[in-house]
């Protein structure tokens, strides 16, 4: 449990596009009194910290530093964004061997100085690397969280909201499973302000059929690839997603977010990290919710878990 105190320290490991933008989003949110940036490229890290610090007059008081792992000591949350970036045409799972090796050097250093921190993994493939972090750190599963499908779920809400011309925040739904190509949309539990989506569409004379679901799902699944093809990387939306998770932890909100967590017995799925609706609070993941899926969704979720397990088993550097 995050203890109530006058200061809140967040460390961000990796000062690339995602890490730096995450630090910026955290700074704007006002959730931390200290943000520490760590990266192998020390010059860039110093530059990012300087640039952010120059905006001190426009946000709540926050001390932004660049440093080494020792400077992260006593962090409440350590956000891990370090790793090789996803290239055009490259899947998240193809990043695995590069990033596992990077994590083997990062995680022991993080743990050395942060025995009580909550670790929030953002680097891709996030589900696999969350599991790797869980194993390398020796931390309880509650304190090793992946950003999971929080961003994918926002993308799904955005797609539905855009088509139905409603506020995406009024759409209740989840993307579950891998943050990647095998993720699933939980149409069977999707609703618009507690009205089932099929009933809402029928009542409002809106499209809701197999073609609608396929188009929306494909747009969500391929969203990152589309962004990468156009601008080379995704970082704004994921930074906001990370900030949302951090706020839930620091505020002990006990809110439900589809983060990546260790699944132990859900539709027969065990010993793998997946994006699942979880209660997130001051202890990290307080409970994973076993929502009822239809047979098709459950089958796809099992396949998603198998995809991730096979990737882990085939990783040459484990």
From Swiss-Prot:
PROSITE patterns, A to Z: L_LDH
EC number assigned by the record: 1.1.1.27
Keywords tagged on the record: Cytoplasm, NAD, Oxidoreductase, Phosphoprotein
InterPro entries, per database record: L-lactate/malate_DH, L-lactate_DH, L-lactate_DH_AS, Lactate/malate_DH_C, Lactate/malate_DH_N, Lactate_DH/Glyco_Ohase_4_C, NAD(P)-bd_dom_sf
Residues involved in NAD(+) binding: 18, 39, 44, 69, 83-84, 105, 122-124, 147
Pathway per the UniProt entry: Fermentation; pyruvate fermentation to lactate; (S)-lactate from pyruvate: step 1/1
Lineage top rank: taxon: Bacteria
UniProt binding sites for substrate: 86, 92, 124-127, 152-155, 234
Phosphotyrosine: modified positions: 225
Record-level Gene Ontology MF annotations: L-lactate dehydrogenase activity
GO process annotations (BP): glycolytic process; lactate metabolic process; pyruvate metabolic process
Keyword Phosphoprotein carried by entry: yes
CDD domains cross-referenced by the UniProt entry: LDH_2 (cd05292)
Catalytic residues (positions): 179 (proton acceptor)
Catalytic activity: (S)-lactate + NAD(+) = pyruvate + NADH + H(+)
Location in or out of the cell: Cytoplasm
Subunit structure: Homotetramer.
Role noted for this protein: Catalyzes the conversion of lactate to pyruvate.
Protein name: L-lactate dehydrogenase
Taxon lineage: Bacteria, Bacillati, Bacillota, Clostridia, Eubacteriales
GN (gene name): ldh
